Each structure stands twice: as structure tokens, then as C-alpha cells.
Amino acid sequence: MASTFARALSARRSAGLLAMVGAGSLAAGFLLARDTVSAGERQRRRYPPSAEYPDLRKHNNCMASNLTPAIYARLCDKATPNGWTLDQCIQTGVDNPGHPFIKTVGMVAGDEETYEVFAELFDPVIQERHNGYNPRTMKHVTDLDASKIKFGHFDERYVLSSRVRTGRSIRGLSLPPACTRAERREVEKVTVEALNGLTGDLSGRYYRLSEMTEKEQQQLIDDHFLFDKPVSPSLTAAGMARDWPDARGIWHNNEKTFLIWINEEDHTRVISMEKGGNMKRVFERFCRGLKEVERLIQERGWEFMWNERLGYILTCPSNLGTGLRAGVHIKLPLLSKDSRFPKILENLRLQKRGTGGVDTAATANVFDISNLDRLGKSEVELVQLVIDGVNYLIDCERRLEKGQDIRIPSPVPQFRH
């Protein structure tokens, strides 16, 4: 039960709040708002902020673009009620300057309150990363009605597999960069107990990483079912790999078409996937399974982190809002060699990854193509954007096969301010 674990959080959470309302009420009823979040005790510094300001002159990430010396001076002594500081938020971006041609985010949250206590930095980073979405004035919309999707079956001569994923965080527990071992184990316990209530085609079982052989783990990784140990410097610098593989694992249904990763980059990653090009069926299963998981979580006195400005709260600002990434593995041997390919993707608000995901190379001209944005558009809108965009890429590939010319599409409109 939530109330049992809450006592162990008293050193990190507001003991008075827990004592007054109880952990169950806290988990079920805490609505995050700027006027209700107070920072923790100010940090005592030996040197002035100007002496502590990081050298960001060669950095190419959103954090570095927005963190001025003045903002650093105003925020560097603040902390969330958990004690999470600005320097902890930005350390991964300081340590990892980014790629000259690929702009990363460069910062993470340690808890739900991070986005409020350090809003002066997070808000402009969010606006830059999410195509102009202004968290100060805009509200996020959720829509999990899969019946609204149109033209959701791709030509399988090009599309090899389809996948939709999102992340969800358990309210009242710190996010992976900041969580204690006890909190991480509680995330696992709460989630697995809820997942055991799934029935029908969603029913399955949980597999702990610590109980798998290396061969079993590698096979699941090779089949694109399981996450690998975080070895990326941006993840390790953020503290994602601490205590590995304690309290990490994968839950999947019997058909391995509905999966939940536990305690990787986020508390949970919910995934619907299958071979072939039936994105509409993948999204329908995703919506149905996600709604059922949330219902089962709430039955146990917990809930997901959410607010109307930022949508669902996750570790990286790039995943706020829907947290949704709808993607395909697609063969594009001709288009991928065309100099216009990057601009086409940019205008369609799509991103390209290697066959094995982020930081991997494309194998046999197979790319992982997915939506770039997460926030400010609903799940239905983003999946439809991917469907329309992937169909455009397929049309370009067909035209190139016939020796015909292709054109760069008009950019997807940015948000209105």
C-alpha cells in the first residue's frame, strides 16, 4: 500500500504534509501548481554564483542556450523539497556538450517539483525543444481515442515494424536521476502489482533483470524488446545507471506486443509494438492498455504525475506532454542518400535514428523514424502526424525508384504564442 512506503519517504518529503493528509491522499490528490510549490532550504555556497557558472561556450544543447549567468545566480541556491538542485539538473548537459549538428536537451528533472522550482530555465528550454510550445500560457491536451486515426496501415514493402511508446511517472516518488534504492524498488512493486491485474490479450508476466541470464537479456535486446544498461554519457552523468540492475525489469504480454519497461530512464515506459505496418492496430492496443494500467495504478492509491501545462511529467523535458513516440522501422535506400532527406524530416517534424535506436547506425538502409514533438499536441494528433509523414516518405522513395523528382514539404506550423 502507498501508506506503508510513505513513512520511509519522510526524510525526503515534507513530513508535516504526510502526517496531515496521509500518503494515499498525497498520491491521489496532489495537484502541482506554481503557487503551491516551495523550494527547499537554500544551499550554502563558499563562492559566489559567478565563480560557479559553468563554461558553456562550446556546448550545443538547449540548456546551454538558455542558461544565462543571471538565471544561474537566481536559481543556483534553490532546491526542491527533495533537495534536488539546479546544478544536478544541468550536470549531464555540462558534461556532455552535444553534437555540432544535433542539439540535445542537456538537463533532467529529479522530481515533479523540479519543473516548477526551476521554471525560469525549464520553461524556455521546453519552448525551444517543443516547436514553440509556451508552458507559461498554453495547456496540453490528452486524447487516447484510437478510432480517430485515418490511413494507419503502411506499405509493408517499406515498413518492417510499428511501435508506439510513452512514459509514466508515479506521483510522490523521485524520478530516476534522484531516486533512492527504496523509491526505485517501490516503483517496481507498485507497477508490477498493478500489471498483474491485466487480463485478456494484455495479460503476461514480469521478468527482473537481476534474475535473467546474460544470454536471455541479450536476446531480448537484440529482438528490440528490452532496454540495455545505460552506457550513454548523457544518461550516466544524470545518474540513470546507479545500482544497476536493481529493481529494473520488463513486463510483457504473452504475444510480446504490449510491454512495460520498469526503472530505465523513467519510472515506466509503456510500449505497443508488432512487426509490419499496421500502426492503427498498434495504437489501439496502446490506448487500451495504457488506460487499463492507469486504472489499476489508481486502484492501489497511486497516480501518475500530470499537470495541465506540461501534461505527463517525465525525467527529460523532451518527453513531457504525451511522452509519446510513435515510430516505424522503414527501408529508405534511395531517399536516405538524398541531400534533401534531413530537411524533409525537419519540415514533417519527424526524427531519424539508427536501426537500434538513439546513438546507433542504420543497418541495411533501415531507419527508425518517429515524431519529434511530444508536448502541445495530443496522442491522436502525433500518431496521425507520423502516419501522414511516413506515407510521404514512402511516396518519395517510390518516386525516386521511378527516376522522378521529389519536393520538400511545407513546414508543420509552429504553435501560436
UniProtKB/Swiss-Prot annotation:
Membrane-protein topology: Peripheral membrane protein
BP terms from Gene Ontology: phosphocreatine biosynthetic process
Reaction(s) the record says it catalyses: creatine + ATP = N-phosphocreatine + ADP + H(+)
InterPro entries: ATP-guanido_PTrfase (IPR000749), ATP-guanido_PTrfase_AS (IPR022415), ATP-guanido_PTrfase_cat (IPR022414), ATP-guanido_PTrfase_N (IPR022413), ATP-guanido_PTrfase_N_sf (IPR036802), Gln_synth/guanido_kin_cat_dom (IPR014746)
Top-level class of the enzyme under EC nomenclature: transferase
Gene3D superfamilies: ATP:guanido phosphotransferase, N-terminal domain, Glutamine synthetase/guanido kinase, catalytic domain
Domain of life: Eukaryota
Keywords: ATP-binding, Kinase, Membrane, Mitochondrion, Mitochondrion inner membrane, Nucleotide-binding, Transferase, Transit peptide
Classification via PROSITE patterns: PHOSPHAGEN_KINASE (PS00112), PHOSPHAGEN_KINASE_C (PS51510), PHOSPHAGEN_KINASE_N (PS51509)
Binding site for ATP: 161-165, 224, 269, 325, 353-358, 368
EC identifiers of the protein: 2.7.3.2
Recorded GO CC terms: mitochondrial inner membrane; mitochondrion
MF annotations from Gene Ontology: ATP binding; creatine kinase activity
Pfam families for the chain: ATP-gua_Ptrans, ATP-gua_PtransN
tRNA processing recorded as keyword: no
Function: Reversibly catalyzes the transfer of phosphate between ATP and various phosphogens (e.g. creatine phosphate). Creatine kinase isoenzymes play a central role in energy transduction in tissues with large, fluctuating energy demands, such as skeletal muscle, heart, brain and spermatozoa.
Family: Belongs to the ATP:guanido phosphotransferase family.
Note: Mitochondrial creatine kinase binds cardiolipin.
Protein name, per record: Creatine kinase U-type, mitochondrial
Organism lineage string: Eukaryota, Metazoa, Chordata, Craniata, Vertebrata
